[in-house]
């Protein structure tokens, strides 16, 4: 009887030991399965309630994953930067009329509402002072353009042109037409842009102004390029504008001509040709000490290298462009540069510089465009 009891005892004891061993093995197996990332280091292995024994969260995202997502999120904003650069160029190229010099006494203080501007203009129109009326309208259009009010600027210039055409001020009429052409091109209205630029060119021919003719031909070429008539655009610059500028020894305008031609090649994705003309522009600018366009030229050179995936050279040229843009205090161009530099750093897995570039980008973008949503 005692032997039988001992046998039962050892059998039960063996079963208990076996179960404990199995539980331990299962726990060890669970340890390996429940948290492969290794972040859960303490949990109740005896839990037998509702739900899973352990809620395992995904491992924290890596620095590379966070940066990759941030760079993807800002990709959609590149068009806004390019558009802002075009507007900045448009404002810089806006010509003033002679009539504006004679209306300054009426603009102290400057009207701060649309109705105040309208009252001022209407009073001069009623008096038959059309010179003053279009001078005021042109000034108002310039102010509207700087605020990015494109439609308003176009409307004001159209009205200014109507009043200017009641006078004999041919030069001012041409200036208004030139400004209209440029704004219509920015607004992607190719037909109207071409109409007004041709009118400006015809006046330049009549007045035998070589530089104005060449400048207008450059604009006509850009209009043609945006209309995808690339052959005519190239010929207008190479065969017409450049010879005129050579005859006038207008070196600064020739730099702009090379840039314009390069931009037309970039529109066609012909980046090797674009770089050749940009190098001509850069060499001429350096030889004549015309530094105003150097930052833009260097940026365009770097951009072509970037598109060709020649990242090491592109990086070097973007950094040079950045130094030039900083010396000019051109923050919008700095933003465009750091945007591309960051993309290069990410492509090359240089995450330290990519992170620094992203922070710089965010600071500049907030300063120029407001808070980033």
Predicted segment positions?
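Single-residue signature of alpha-solenoid repeat helices
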Residues: 113, 153, 193, 233-234, ...
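Amphipathic alpha-helical segments of tetratricopeptide repeats
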Residues: 118-123, 158-163, 168, 198-206, ...
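N-terminal leader/linker segments that initiate helical-solenoid repeat arrays
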Residues: 22-135
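Residue register of alpha-helical TPR repeats
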Residues: 135, 175, 215-216, 254-256, ...
């Amino acid at each position: 009887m005692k032997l039988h009891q001992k046998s039962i005892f050892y059998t039960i004891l063996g079963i208990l030991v076996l179960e404990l061993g199995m539980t331990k093995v299962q726990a060890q197996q669970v340890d390996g399965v429940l948290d492969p990332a290794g972040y859960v280091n303490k949990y109740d292995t005896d839990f037998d309630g509702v739900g899973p024994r352990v809620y395992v969260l995904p491992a924290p995202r890596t620095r590379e994953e966070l940066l990759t997502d941030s760079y993807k999120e800002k990709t959609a904003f590149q068009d806004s930067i390019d558009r802002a650069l075009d507007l900045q160029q448009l404002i810089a190229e806006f010509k003033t009329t002679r009539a504006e010099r004679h209306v300054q006494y009426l603009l102290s203080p400057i009207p701060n509402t649309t109705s105040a501007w309208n009252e001022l203009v209407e009073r001069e129109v009623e008096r038959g002072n059309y010179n003053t009326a279009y001078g005021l309208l042109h000034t108002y259009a310039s102010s509207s353009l700087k605020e990015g009010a494109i439609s308003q600027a176009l409307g004001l210039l159209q009205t200014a042109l109507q009043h200017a055409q009641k006078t004999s001020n041919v030069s001012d009429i041409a200036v208004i037409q030139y400004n209209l052409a440029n704004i219509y091109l920015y607004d992607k209205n190719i037909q109207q842009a071409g109409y007004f630029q041709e009118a400006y060119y015809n006046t330049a021919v009549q007045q035998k102004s070589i530089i104005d003719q060449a400048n207008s031909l450059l604009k006509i070429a850009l209009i043609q390029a945006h209309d995808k008539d690339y052959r005519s655009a190239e010929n207008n610059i190479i065969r017409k504008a450049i010879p005129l500028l050579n005859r006038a020894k207008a070196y600064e305008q020739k730099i702009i001509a090379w840039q314009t031609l390069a931009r037309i090649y970039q529109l066609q994705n012909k980046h090797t040709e674009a770089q050749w003309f940009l190098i001509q522009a850069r060499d001429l600018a350096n030889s004549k000490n015309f530094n105003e366009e150097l930052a833009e030229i260097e940026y365009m050179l770097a951009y072509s290298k970037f598109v060709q995936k020649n990242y090491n050279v592109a990086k070097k040229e973007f950094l040079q462009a950045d130094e030039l843009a900083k010396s000019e205090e051109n923050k919008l161009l700095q933003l465009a540069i750091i945007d591309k530099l960051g993309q290069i750093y990410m492509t090359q897995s240089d995450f330290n510089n990519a992170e620094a570039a992203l922070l710089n980008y965010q600071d500049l973008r907030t300063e120029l465009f407001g808070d980033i949503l």
